[in-house]
């Protein structure tokens, strides 16, 4: 596919590689556009960056690269959406300049040490893209559905088997739920979406889930389908079905999405820029210094009313100080563009623009890259 935008040529290759090249001469600095509050983009360094990794941030990366080439004409970034694991491996092997990943570097497998060896300095995990996960459903005659953590967990592990179960009905007063059997649909492929959804079930269910979390669905019930395309296609043809999808996909396919009742209050919360923004703003950081690893358990049991709790955070994994200074300069400029002008209209790409408070934390780390 090819997209035409003013001043830039954009192409998304079949292999999943995103390349954007701007027209025009070089520039030393560009101020952030509307919607970016993190300061100027200081252009420079090598002309072409290479990155790979998370498919969940592929759409956001299109917006980030567009912002980069607009801010720094003549500079490019090539992003290969080949999956988080592959992206981290390529970064550790010094095949790319930074990685996109659904999870931070894993100390239990020695990844931070390997990254420090590759970089000649500590690597930093910078949470840059946040995407809500929607609980989607197809129940004939039902257009509004409220769920909470314990009830959702019991649905996805098979403890609750019909839609008019008293535990579901108690959350949906005024809605006549049918006795239709519940058909759970899950991702049959390994998926960061499955991992994060099950972390929500584990963290928000008061022990009702009991299955742990991994990239493989652990619920033990239901029918599997590959990818968002597979699960949504099966959902749309199966009355009584329920699954989980990335928000952008649920919106694009016009799927019904449940509202979530959280630990912060009795009012059900829908996915909006505001509700997910509250979650991001309240995120707790457990990394040290500029290594901004998040404690995502703070998402699942929010304390602020109106926070949507099921959110996938994805990271850009960068060197704090690159062996080649020209690479460090370019990576810093790209990240400045991503968290500045790249935030404008990001919700149109299925991700949530960074709240100003979190944007400021991220900017301090980004500006320290060298």
UniProtKB/Swiss-Prot annotation:
Extract the signal peptide range.
1-22
What main location does UniProt list? Answer: membrane
Residues the record lists as binding phosphate: 54-56, 84, 102, 191-193
**What are the inducing conditions?**
By phosphate starvation (at protein level).
Task: Report the record's Gene Ontology biological process terms.
Answer: phosphate ion transmembrane transport
State the InterPro entries in the record. ABC_phos-bd_PstS, PBP_domain, Phosphate-bind_PstS
Q: Which GO terms describe its cellular component?
A: ATP-binding cassette (ABC) transporter complex; extracellular region
The record's listing under Pfam families reads: PBP_like_2 (PF12849)
Q: How does it sit in the membrane?
A: Lipid-anchor
Q: Which UniProt keywords apply?
A: Cell membrane, Lipoprotein, Membrane, Palmitate, Phosphate transport, Secreted, Signal, Transport
**GO MF annotation list:** phosphate ion binding
For this protein, the record's Gene3D superfamilies field holds: Periplasmic binding protein-like II
**Where in the cell is the protein located?**
Cell membrane; Secreted
- Lipid moiety-binding region (S-diacylglycerol cysteine): 23
The lipid of kind N-palmitoyl cysteine is covalently joined to: 23
The record's function comment reads:
Functions in inorganic phosphate uptake, a phosphate-binding protein, although probably not the main uptake protein under phosphate starvation. Part of the ABC transporter complex PstSACB involved in phosphate import.
Q: Report quaternary structure and partners.
A: The complex is composed of two ATP-binding proteins (PstB), two transmembrane proteins (PstC and PstA) and a solute-binding protein (PstS).
Regarding protein family, the annotation reads: Belongs to the PstS family.
Name the record gives this protein: Phosphate-binding protein PstS2
Record the organism: Mycobacterium bovis (strain BCG / Pasteur 1173P2)
Q: What is the lineage of its organism?
A: Bacteria, Bacillati, Actinomycetota, Actinomycetes, Mycobacteriales
